[in-house]
């Protein structure tokens, strides 16, 4: 899965919400910490616990004990998941064509001039990094 360990299985939309809560907590987090981040969802503590159990089975979190409490920590960073998730969407919706995705975002997403300029700056920086890498001679 694009830079993520092969042992990981895809997340459902609800599991993704729980992972966002785990990432938002200081690690390791207790179920109560995670519940607090999910307060607006209206989920019962047992529901959150069930999601955490499934996430552990899928390899997304690991659990342990701290005193009387179970604690949870993500096994993957939010950034790594974000990159993987965006790559999946890019492949699924745009056939892997980054330029088509950028055109669609620029023309139909309501991005303001400031956001577009910021995106251009990032793309230019990445382009320069790629050029530097291409010019690198490990033997010279």
Predicted segments, located by residue:
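Conserved segment of winged-helix/HTH DNA-binding domains
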Residues: 77-102
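Short helix-coil junctions and helix-kink-helix linkers
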Residues: 36-45
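Short alpha-helical segments that sit at the start of domains
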Residues: 1-19
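Short helix-capping/hinge SLiMs at alpha-helix to coil transitions
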Residues: 9, 22-28, 41
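C-terminal regulatory/oligomerization modules of transcriptional regulators
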Residues: 107-140
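Short acidic, hydrophobic short linear motifs in intrinsically disordered regions
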Residues: 28-37
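Glycine-centered, phosphate/nucleic-acid-interacting loop/turn motifs that mediate DNA/RNA or nucleotide
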Residues: 59
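Short, cationic-aromatic polyanion-contact patches
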Residues: 10-14, 66-85
């Amino acid at each position: 899965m694009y830079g993520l360990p092969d042992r990981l299985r895809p997340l459902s939309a609800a599991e993704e919400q729980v992972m966002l809560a785990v990432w938002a907590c200081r690690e390791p987090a207790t179920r109560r910490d995670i519940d607090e981040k999910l307060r607006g969802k209206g989920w019962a503590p047992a529901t959150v616990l069930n999601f955490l159990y499934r996430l552990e089975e899928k390899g997304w979190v690991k659990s342990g004990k701290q005193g009387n409490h179970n604690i949870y920590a993500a096994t993957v960073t939010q950034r790594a998941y974000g990159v993987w998730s965006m790559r999946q969407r890019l492949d699924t919706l745009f056939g892997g064509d980054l330029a088509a995705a950028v055109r669609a975002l620029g023309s139909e997403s309501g991005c303001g001039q400031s956001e577009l300029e910021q995106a251009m700056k990032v793309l230019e920086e990445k382009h320069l990094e790629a050029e530097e890498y291409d010019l690198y001679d490990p033997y010279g």
